[in-house]
């Protein structure tokens, strides 16, 4: 796995593990034609796959936030029909919506999408 992609993905995988969500199988797959993109496939236990990527030229915090957004989409699909799909759940609005990955002051954070209140650095849930 590309080192920049690994660095962007590890904090998000930490948050998945902290929530008790099984991490996907990660497979090198340069499916993107963009030379600036570092890409892999995430494979679910049911055999379905999702491609994720980061821009090599983006700042580190933006790579982490972009990866968090894509892994969150994978997790929501994975949880569908089994558990709450509100991952990670917004503490301000329980059962309302999941938090959204954004950047603030050079750090990737999970924030409320309604009022942008930051709650946790990505990787520290």
Regions of interest found by a model, annotated:
Residues 4-16:
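Short, non-transmembrane alpha-helical segments in secretory-pathway proteins
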Residues 15-63:
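Interaction interfaces in information-processing and related assembly proteins
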Residues 56-125:
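Cys/His-clustered metal-coordination modules, chiefly Zn-binding fingers
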